[in-house]
């Protein structure tokens, strides 16, 4: 009897004989079915058939699936849109929060309003187009509190700490320090078993770390608390993007759509930040502050908050779309390039100091991230071969998964 094994492609995940999962970048599982030519959840699929009399050498040779130019252009478009919204949002935050600029007295209140706008807009969109955005599965309460809530809290802390750091330090200095996010993303990826530690990755981490240290060295306007806040934000950034990738790309959670995901995390972010605002923001000083001391000023403040919330909604939505169609690693790599763009804009807009030492540090960071990008691309092209992947399931047993590139290598070997 001929068995047919259907593999869903576009993602990469293998299951070892011991049941451990070796995740490349994404966590979607392969599907085994007895049908052919079926579209599964919008993913392309193809069949590799073998009969009980086939040996490894007689298995049909699989062809590689290349990334289409349309996919590349779509990704580049979303990255460009993300750059635009992010740059404007950074300028907005610094202009409003800077100690020597707008000096808005309540950064946490501002973020609470922004998160609330994101929650309301995403809920309205998923409700109005409920037929389109209705998830196939409903996330369990256990997964909600164990996975969604920590992701939301990590995202809220990332944004709150980043904005708080802008009160004390320049956009250029904050951006360079925040460029350390890939280091923490890798560390969390190791912890969550999304990546396997290797000498190459530790070397890349060392290069990026050296670049960050050079940007901090001889900083003429060094503010300790600003530095602490922005580095904690980098830690939270690594955590939240690892968790975001898990939630967006694992089908069992039913959060693959960015609008559904945002409608789940944004309310938690708004509530948590609102509680912090009640505790930490100087509410007693609002009446005498230039943002709230008259009706006209209060109306202007409301408009500023709504404008910032719309910018934040568009930027975060673009981030989630990028992660859902690519990976957290892609977003982080594109994010570091975005930081370079932000630095250039800040130097011209805010006249931030940019020394040759900072320039060298920035170049080293870019080299480190480029090396990481090359490492991931090379790994995806060649396939990460392990001993478990090299063992082929006997035909009489229930189906195991076989990496197609590895089948090519074994087929061509003596």
UniProtKB/Swiss-Prot annotation:
A cellular-component GO term for this protein: membrane
Pfam families to which the protein is assigned, alphabetical: TPT
EamA domain segment(s): 106-216
Protein's cellular compartments: Membrane
Parts of the chain that traverse the membrane: 72-92, 101-121, 172-192, 197-217, 224-244, 259-279, 303-323, 328-348, 354-374
Keywords: Membrane, Sugar transport, Transmembrane, Transmembrane helix, Transport
Superkingdom of origin: Eukaryota
Membrane topology classification: Multi-pass membrane protein
UniProt family annotation: Belongs to the TPT transporter family. TPT (TC 2.A.7.9) subfamily.
Protein name: Probable sugar phosphate/phosphate translocator At1g06470
């Amino acid at each position: 009897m001929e068995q047919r094994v259907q593999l869903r492609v576009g993602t990469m995940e293998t299951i070892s004989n011991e049941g451990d999962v070796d995740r490349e970048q994404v966590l979607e599982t392969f599907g085994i079915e007895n049908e052919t030519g079926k579209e599964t959840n919008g993913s392309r699929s193809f069949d590799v058939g073998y009969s009980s009399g086939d040996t490894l050498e007689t298995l049909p040779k699989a062809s590689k699936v290349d990334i289409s130019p349309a996919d590349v252009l779509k990704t580049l478009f979303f990255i460009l849109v993300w750059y635009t919204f992010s740059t404007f949002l950074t300028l907005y935050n610094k202009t409003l929060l800077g100690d020597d600029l707008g000096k808005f007295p309540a950064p946490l209140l501002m973020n609470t309003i922004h998160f609330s706008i994101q929650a309301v807009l995403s809920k309205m969109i998923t409700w109005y187009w409920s037929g389109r955005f209705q998830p196939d599965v409903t996330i369990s309460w256990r997964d909600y509190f164990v996975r969604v809530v920590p992701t939301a809290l990590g995202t809220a802390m990332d944004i709150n700490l980043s904005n708080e750091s802008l009160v004390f330090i320049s956009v250029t200095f904050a951006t360079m320090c925040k460029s350390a996010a890939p280091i923490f993303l890798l560390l969390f990826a190791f912890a969550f078993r999304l990546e396997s530690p290797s000498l190459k990755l530790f070397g890349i981490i060392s290069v990026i770390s050296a670049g960050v240290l050079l940007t901090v060295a001889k900083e003429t306007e060094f503010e300790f608390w600003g530095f602490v806040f922005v580095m904690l934000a980098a830690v939270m950034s690594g955590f939240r993007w690892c968790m975001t990738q898990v939630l967006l790309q694992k089908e069992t959670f039913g959060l693959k759509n960015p609008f559904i995901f945002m409608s789940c995390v944004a309310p938690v972010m708004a509530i948590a930040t609102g509680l912090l605002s009640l505790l930490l923001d100087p509410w007693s000083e609002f009446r005498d502050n230039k943002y709230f001391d008259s009706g006209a000023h209060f109306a202007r403040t409301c408009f500023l908050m709504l404008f910032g919330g719309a910018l934040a909604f568009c930027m975060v939505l673009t981030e989630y779309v990028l992660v859902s169609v690519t990976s957290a690693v892609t977003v982080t790599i594109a994010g570091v390039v975005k930081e370079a763009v932000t630095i250039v804009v800040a130097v011209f807009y805010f006249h931030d100091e940019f020394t040759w030492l900072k320039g060298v540090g920035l170049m080293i960071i870019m080299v480190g991230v480029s090396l990481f990008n090359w490492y991931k691309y090379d790994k995806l092209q060649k396939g990460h071969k392990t001993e478990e992947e090299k063992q082929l399931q006997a035909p009489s047993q229930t189906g195991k998964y076989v990496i197609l590139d590895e089948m090519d290598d074994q087929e061509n070997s003596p």
